[in-house]
Amino acid sequence: MASEDKFESVLSTRYCKNSPLVSILSETNKATLWRQLWIWLAEAEKELGLKQVTQDAIDEMKSNRDVFDWPFIRSEERKLKHDVMAHNHAFGKLCPTAAGIIHLGATSCFVQDNADLIAYRDSIDHILKRFATVIDRLAAFSLKNKEVVTVGRTHYQTASLVTVGKRGVLWAQELLMAFQSLSEFRDKMRFRGIKGATGTQDSFLTLFAGDESKVEALDELVTKKANFSNRFLITGQTYSRQQDSQLVFSLSLLGAAAKKVCTDIRVLQAFGELLEPFEKDQIGSSAMPYKKNPMKSERCCALSRKLINAPQEALTILADQGLERTLDDSAGRRMLIPDVLLTAEALLTTLQNIFEGLSVQTDNVKKIVEDEIAFLGLEKAMMMLTEEGVDRQQAHAVIRKTALEAKQLQATQKVDIRQTMADPFFDSVRDRVVGLVNNPINFTGRCVSQTESFIAKELKPTIDKYLDKSAGNVQLDV
């Protein structure tokens, strides 16, 4: 059956079809990891002295690790209703010498949980590299526009001047904090290890004739072979699903940060100040050919919503895990965590494309500043007046009255700074303020130095470990 004739997740077929995550999270990779875990377990058991595990058996497992008889596996699972045992039988069929020691001492969660954790770790490593590139692209945009003066907005209303670059590093800070959360999770992530059917390690204690030190060594050795630095010291049958919730929450922070950034871009595109990349043959509307819609930012907001809402499901999976283990978690985890990882990848890929082509509509930005500078210069006037001993509250009251009257005039005519400062109250500072208005950068405070400092002192050092400096630009298929 052709792929177009059956339903497939849009994450893997539309938004992430060229991503390595599609392979990392695939059934084949999962099954390969299960077999690799069986190999590591056998190697470690042999190294610690189990006579029934032979080198011939291990070599046979290694040589057949990547050979899959999928029709047989599906047939076995249909009959047994147990995926791990179906794969166990299939691997044993390929490896008759090893069949008797495959899965020795283990429970299903040895392969299921540990393989999931390896796949999650590898996915996170890729996502962190992508994330670092996204933040780096936004930093470049911010530095490029660090001196481009624009109207600040609080409550979506005109506020004191900022620069486009300073606004860019505010966005970068939100993304960087989410990046740090995910990076910290990655560094602390724990492997399940070998714990047995209910977490007591009794089966392994039996195999090693009651020698607890060898059971501890086996747990450490398998963890090391899987290239994890940390492991759970205690588990039930499964590792704590709180770790899954922490992963999902870290990615939900990415979703929230990205939605804030992309909502801002959409608003600023509506104001005519920014324009997300619009490709040569791109069509904005089937009915209105003149439109340039911020569809990439809109897509990011939609993907972000999925990440923002995901922790609720992860928390219920954690809460419903009964005693040493129930299957309340199984179906949910199979769907939730791969979807969250792929959604994060789709979001970051689209964000990277936006930041690589985001442009400032400088003429319109300049016009908006010129229209508002007559009002925005009054804050500077208030500070100057207080320097001369004027009561700050008195200055505020006079400026408020003057500005509101001028705002009414602005509806029908252009207002300049001399009109808003016509009151004799401003005589001592008027010329100084008017002189500054000719160069609006004078009203942006430390925007330029803040932008440079944040990128140099915080942003760059944080992402450097994961940043691929040779990464090319992203081209979106849709």
Swiss-Prot record:
Metal-binding found in the keyword field: no
Annotated EC: 4.3.2.2
GO molecular function (one): (S)-2-(5-amino-1-(5-phospho-D-ribosyl)imidazole-4-carboxamido) succinate lyase (fumarate-forming) activity
Protein's job: Catalyzes two non-sequential steps in de novo AMP synthesis: converts (S)-2-(5-amino-1-(5-phospho-D-ribosyl)imidazole-4-carboxamido)succinate (SAICAR) to fumarate plus 5-amino-1-(5-phospho-D-ribosyl)imidazole-4-carboxamide, and thereby also contributes to de novo IMP synthesis, and converts succinyladenosine monophosphate (SAMP) to AMP and fumarate.
Family the entry assigns: Belongs to the lyase 1 family. Adenylosuccinate lyase subfamily.
Lineage summary: Eukaryota, Metazoa, Ecdysozoa, Nematoda, Chromadorea
Originating gene: adsl-1
Gene Ontology CC terms, in alphabetical order: cytosol
Cross-referenced InterPro entries: AdenyloSucc_lyase_C, Fumarate_lyase_CS, Fumarate_lyase_fam, Fumarate_lyase_N, L-Aspartase-like
Catalytic activity line of the entry: N(6)-(1,2-dicarboxyethyl)-AMP = fumarate + AMP; (2S)-2-[5-amino-1-(5-phospho-beta-D-ribosyl)imidazole-4-carboxamido]succinate = 5-amino-1-(5-phospho-beta-D-ribosyl)imidazole-4-carboxamide + fumarate
Main enzyme class: lyase
UniProt-listed GO biological process terms: 'de novo' AMP biosynthetic process; 'de novo' IMP biosynthetic process
Keywords: Lyase, Purine biosynthesis
Record-annotated active site: 155 (proton donor/acceptor), 285 (proton donor/acceptor)
Pathway: Purine metabolism; AMP biosynthesis via de novo pathway; AMP from IMP: step 2/2; Purine metabolism; IMP biosynthesis via de novo pathway; 5-amino-1-(5-phospho-D-ribosyl)imidazole-4-carboxamide from 5-amino-1-(5-phospho-D-ribosyl)imidazole-4-carboxylate: step 2/2
Quaternary data: Homotetramer. Residues from neighboring subunits contribute catalytic and substrate-binding residues to each active site.
Organism: Caenorhabditis elegans
Any Pfam family: Lyase_1
Binding site for substrate: 14-15, 81-83, 107-108, 237, 299, 325, 330, 334
Name of the protein: Adenylosuccinate lyase
